[in-house]
């Protein structure tokens, strides 16, 4: 029986890239996996066929040979045969993780670096919460922070072993850091119980770090907070996290910003909002009010006569700067008419006199319109009752 074309087996074009090959293989491998098709010989044959096709096309050298000579390029036994080689075992472990959860206790992390858990290991990322004022968010600032961090032990240079000694390869996992157990068609990897995933054994640990290869130190860092930052913004400082293990790269430090509530301004993006009280006289006759600005200055706003509560005034360019831009938001001032309290006898007399003078409809257009609509409503009810 002649072999099918590998591209046809996976259902991809000859120009398919690595991602497309991997996606097609995952789909077919899961569809024909013997655990999903118990006793189905045809599914088992197709499963092996899919594996063989992927083993060839996912390898650049094998793919080049196949594209040139076809199946004849592997007449001496084929690309790894129909069984499960080491690479396929790794890939099936990846599929198992994707569909059924992580079967590797402790999490082996991303593959690479020769596949040895005892090799270089990246340090953990750190988080620091920084609260600043709205004024500081307006101007930007440089903040000095202190944080405890795991850094490489200077005594053992991160090896974890006492000076004059060095770690030895773990005999249980051979330095791999994981042990593999075959279960049916799956090769499940677990953290090595002997070395706890390090891939090495330290017989004589460093006294300074206790064999960890790292010690905790308090570091001082300067954080540049740019103007225009908003609540919830995250600043990443690459390489300022915890030191890596066994020469691995350091993690990153993430600064999470929060803005303190302001007693006068509310913020919406780059725009600022505030509410300012005005007197009845200013609202009726006009006047000027002085309003603070976020930059620390003050500005004067002209209030025209007849201004009503919730009237809004816009001051262009008096808001917050837009992050990493030359644009600036606006300041919106909303006024509300404050009713006087604790009046003197004379003040009461003047207000009563003002009320007794009578009011024309155009003096209170909103009130006149409101009461006119109320009268029409009740007149309509009376008319319908008589009918």
Curated annotation (Swiss-Prot):
ATP-binding found in the keyword field: no
Binding-site residues, Zn(2+) 1: 153, 156, 206, 209
Signal peptide limits: none
Renumbered ranges of CXXCXGXG motif repeats: 153-160, 170-177, 192-199, 206-213
Keyword Zinc-finger: yes
GO CC terms of this entry: cytoplasm
Cellular localization per UniProt: Cytoplasm
Positions of CR-type zinc fingers: 140-218
InterPro entries found in the cross-reference section: DnaJ, DnaJ_C, DnaJ_domain, DnaJ_domain_CS, HSP40/DnaJ_pept-bd, HSP_DnaJ_Cys-rich_dom, HSP_DnaJ_Cys-rich_dom_sf, J_dom_sf
CDD domains the UniProt entry points to: DnaJ, DnaJ_C, DnaJ_zf
Function: Participates actively in the response to hyperosmotic and heat shock by preventing the aggregation of stress-denatured proteins and by disaggregating proteins, also in an autonomous, DnaK-independent fashion. Unfolded proteins bind initially to DnaJ; upon interaction with the DnaJ-bound protein, DnaK hydrolyzes its bound ATP, resulting in the formation of a stable complex. GrpE releases ADP from DnaK; ATP binding to DnaK triggers the release of the substrate protein, thus completing the reaction cycle.
Domain notes: The J domain is necessary and sufficient to stimulate DnaK ATPase activity. Zinc center 1 plays an important role in the autonomous, DnaK-independent chaperone activity of DnaJ. Zinc center 2 is essential for interaction with DnaK and for DnaJ activity.
Protein name: Chaperone protein DnaJ
Organism field: Methylobacterium sp. (strain 4-46)
Gene: dnaJ
